[in-house]
Amino acid sequence: MIKGFGILEMLISLSLGLGILTVIIAHATETGRIAKKITSNQERLEAIFHTVDTIKSDLNKCGMRLQEACKFFNIPSFESSQGNFKVTYGLAEEELLENALPGQQTLKIAQNEFFKKDKVVLIYNLARQVWEFNEIRDFSGGALVLKNSLQNDFPGNSPVLVLKKVEYKFYPAQRMLKRKTDKGNFQPLLEEVSDFYVTFFPDANSVLYRIEVNKKEQIRGYIFLLNLVQP
């Protein structure tokens, strides 16, 4: 008798080996899929948390430093429509160091790092009941240079506010919520968004927002606009 494995035994052994290898490969593949899914879920959750924090931060700032101007001049600091909302707030405030006359394109104020080129400014005076928006061209020679000539007469000590505007917009076709600041372009904030809406309650100075992701997860937030003053 010849010692060793017969052909049948070798085939059985080979089949068992291939079976074990197939199980190992299948297990490794499934493990990889699970790990990838976990990573994807974690990234989505992080994106959702970041979006919620960003919305909350912007809404909490809405109307900041604009309380006086909004009350007397009916300047909106919150606006909303279907799948869209805008907030405006003041970044910094200075007072005119000298009178500013109609036709003038400079404002004498203390130098402030927030008063940068292309930023929108609000100049107003309660006693004269005048206000207007303008844009910064430059800061030169201790004065703020404006892009447009003044339309009104502003005495010294009139407040000058530099503003920040933030806008959120839902793009249903792209399934994406985007955000932009001032005159910038809309940038992606959250993907796979299947629905987004905002409801403003003027009597309570509050906002309810709802984000739906992949038609499964829903995130709701209710925030009081503590800095918002209505006329």
What spans do the regions from the language model cover?
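Aliphatic-rich helix starts adjacent to a transmembrane/signal segment
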Residues: 2-56, 60
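Short, exposed beta-strand "edge-strand" segments with a Pro/Gly-rich flavor and a Y/T-containing core
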Residues: 4, 99-100, 183-186
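Mixed-charge, low-complexity intrinsically disordered regions
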Residues: 8, 35, 42, 52, ...
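Residue-level signal for the start and early helices of compact helical domains
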Residues: 22-25, 29, 35, 39, ...
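Extracytoplasmic beta-strand-rich oligomerization domains located immediately C-terminal to a leader/signal peptide
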Residues: 34, 38-172
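Short linear sequence signals and composition-biased patches located at protein termini or domain-edge surfaces
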Residues: 76-80, 164-167, 172-231
